[in-house]
Amino acid sequence: MVMRSWPAPTVVALPDHGGPLSVHDTVTGSRRTITPGATARMYVCGITPYDAAHLGHAFTYLTFDLVNRVWRDAGHTVDYVQNITDIDDPLLERAAATGQDWQELAAREIQVFREDMAALRILPPRAFLGVVESMDLIADFVARLRAQGVTYEVDGDIYFSAADAPGFGSLSQLDRTAMLELFAERGGDPGRAGKKDPLDWLLWRAERPGEPAWDTPLGRGRPGWHVECSAISVHELGMGFDLNGGGDDLIFPHHEMGAAEACCATGSRPQARHYLHVAMVGLDGEKMSKSRGNLVFVSQLRKAGTDPMAIRLALLAHHYRTAWEWTDADLRTAEQRLERWRAAAAVENAPDARPLLARVRSALADDLDTATALAAVDEWADAALSGSGDDPDAPALMRTTVDTLLGVALDR
């Protein structure tokens, strides 16, 4: 199955340009200003297509949509790549448990994801690549690692030797005990017999009875999780791209191990110049996750008649680095805000919106400070609705500011 992205919303250029984006870099643990060239390159890890897309997914992809929008407003072209993990153990397990064909399950969930992203006005990636369609390039990447002497086999499976990765652990800054604990929790196999080190991870899984497998020079099998993203990112963006990101549960092992693979395969570093990770969204006191089953789905909210722009505004009310819990009150507040903004955008004369544009630009450039950006729009809307201001061009500039930078369409 060849992946296709979703339709791109129209993005109207604003007067002048915004400034550079400063974010909290996971590797340094500090604020850093990202300084791309003419083209900003970004890779974001995609979903495993079952139970998609819940609000945790939406919050993550909204965050990187803001990065995309800020970069574009600053005058950059953005080369954005995202994968889809359309073959993986959890997908196969869900298909078996529900009596579905795994390919049909994946195709259905990917289509729902596309529809949700389009409804939320998330700018689509230039390349939206599934693992299945990328099988040859992933197998070639594993072969490159094997040629570098950093792999070994256990019963036909190919493993990466963590001891052969220079600087392993520098991304996550975790000690060995914490690494082993998270590796076991997040899809690793530290207890497998025959491994040289419990932290060594799977690159290629040899064919098992009853499991899908592909013919490659490595033999029949399928890739491990981490190498899928490292292979696709290197193929599409090269090394040293500007930003690698995802949820903060990907810091270790996924991004740590993927970076080690990319650096060893290419002989260069870093894989990415900056790493940005998004906090988790909770429900009923726990992280929203597939394993817990405590999910709120974008598609369900949409089917219930919720305006996708209200969903987007509810997510925008929270900062990407702060974990939070979804409540019905979040949505009610967002719906009220959306109505107020739409009413303000419809007045004939309003206060000058150029200061509003400057404030929203400044807030987003400052580590994606969405709360400050929303407050600035609220203040302008309140003034406009009170009859203040006599600028007939202001409502149009306000609408474009909110649409282009925050991704919120105020047309009904």
Curated annotation (Swiss-Prot):
Cystine crosslinks: none
Residue positions binding Zn(2+): 45, 229, 254
NCBIfam families documented for this protein: mycothiol_MshC
Coiled-coil segments: none
Classification via HAMAP family: MshC
Swiss-Prot/TrEMBL catalytic activity: 1D-myo-inositol 2-amino-2-deoxy-alpha-D-glucopyranoside + L-cysteine + ATP = 1D-myo-inositol 2-(L-cysteinylamino)-2-deoxy-alpha-D-glucopyranoside + AMP + diphosphate + H(+)
EC numbers on record: 6.3.1.13
Protein name: L-cysteine:1D-myo-inositol 2-amino-2-deoxy-alpha-D-glucopyranoside ligase
Entry keyword Zinc: yes
Motif ('ERGGDP' region): 185-190
Quaternary state and interactors: Monomer.
One GO molecular-function entry: cysteine-glucosaminylinositol ligase activity
This protein's record includes keyword DNA damage: no
Entry similarity comment: Belongs to the class-I aminoacyl-tRNA synthetase family. MshC subfamily.
